[in-house]
Curated annotation (Swiss-Prot):
Organism per entry: Caldanaerobacter subterraneus subsp. tengcongensis (strain DSM 15242 / JCM 11007 / NBRC 100824 / MB4) (Thermoanaerobacter tengcongensis)
Protein name, entry field: Large ribosomal subunit protein bL28
Protein family per UniProt: Belongs to the bacterial ribosomal protein bL28 family.
Record's keyword terms, sorted: Ribonucleoprotein, Ribosomal protein
PANTHER family assigned: 50S RIBOSOMAL PROTEIN L28, LARGE RIBOSOMAL SUBUNIT PROTEIN BL28A
Domain of life of the source: Bacteria
UniProt cross-references to Gene3D superfamilies, sorted A to Z: Ribosomal protein L28/L24 (2.30.170.40)
GO molecular function, one term: structural constituent of ribosome
Gene (name only): rpmB
């Protein structure tokens, strides 16, 4: 599972509880996009979460 290259956000594990309170392991996955960005004047493909994209932490290459 990819992680965000900016903030390091990745998937987390937890339990899903049924009505009878039985639990099974489930995963929460971040909204990660592959983005072409400009890093040190070169075009690089990064895995970036949607929160970092909205915050403007990545300068996208057009």
């Amino acid at each position: 599972m990819p992680k965000c290259d900016i903030c390091g956000k990745g998937s987390i594990r937890g339990f899903q509880y049924s009505h009878s309170n039985r639990r099974t392991i489930r995963r929460w996955k971040p909204n990660i996009r592959k983005v072409r960005a400009i890093v040190d004047g070169t075009h690089v493909t990064l895995n970036v979460c949607a929160k970092c994209l909205k915050a403007g932490k990545v300068q996208r290459a057009l």
